[in-house]
Amino acid sequence: GGGASQAQISQRNLELLDIYNAEIWHQITKNWAFSQEMGGGHANLEAVIIVKIMRDGEIRDVWFEKRSGNSYFDDSAHKAVKKSNPLPPLPEGFLKPFYEVGFRFNLSELERHP
């Protein structure tokens, strides 16, 4: 048949997801309010949050894979994700019922998104 191979479909999905990830990360960081003073001057704080996104962009679940150890920092990252609900719908070619993705929150990321 003249259909696309599984590898081509996967490659296209990865490209779509890269674009989607950049889009939703931009949306989340816009909602991220954190001041370094409140973090007690720790420049190396980092938290990893996993987000479960439904096909329509609804955030169904949010949990920490790794906490920073600073509750103010962790709360600010968690709130940024919650505030971003709903996200844009998943890309057309993405066939699974939901998408789970991890976001790494750290202060160097925050500085890059003024």
Spans of features found by a protein language model:
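Compositionally biased, low-complexity segments enriched in charged/polar and small residues
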Residues: 1-48, 54, 58-63, 71-75, ...
